[in-house]
Amino acid sequence: MHVLFVERHGLEETEVPVDLDHQPADLVILSFSDSDLGAFAAGWQRAKTQNEHDFPSIRLANLASLKHPISVDTYIEKTLRHASGILIRLIGGVPYWSYGLNQVAQIAKRHNIAFAVIPADGRSDKQLDEISSVPVSTLRRLQHLCEIGGEVAAHSALAQLALAAGLYASPVSGSKMIGNVGAWTPEHNLCCPFIARGFDPKPLILITFYRSFITAADLKPISALF
């Protein structure tokens, strides 16, 4: 399909149409947060490293790239309509992406796609529940896992979405919870500070970093310091 990008008036005046050109996948995750998308990428990679070779394929996209109606229509045509499950984590409710939600809901109903829309601000939203096609109990589990953050919770959320879409996903092992404080090392991952300290008599340097590095599974900069 060819998309002609021309000057337009009245349609998201500050936005320019974008063709993400994503190939179809089993599951598609959309969010305005790069931290969300980074965690889901790490969660999917975790599934693969645990020899889940048949784990569903995924595509990740930032909703900031899908603000223009042409961008939405193109992404639906190329990617979303071929998916088995779609998860959207939205901040601000329906008004922040009303055209996209309406169009994706229609395509999900037409193609029997498991469609979940969850709020990213920690509050319940009945409008998003009504737009979604999966049970409210599934929405709450997905919301809880996304609010926890980190690669294990993201792995679990992907598995939950896969099951809702009728795809196979193995049970997810490992602790999903992330404490408000704690320790992390490349060797032990999340752990008790006493374990991180170990019994090595050599002096150690304490590196302090934000918890959000863990919830976004963005630990490469920290790991590089070890």
What are the residue ranges of the model-derived segments?
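An N-terminal assembly and electron-transfer interface module characteristic of large anaerobic redox
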Residues: M1-F226
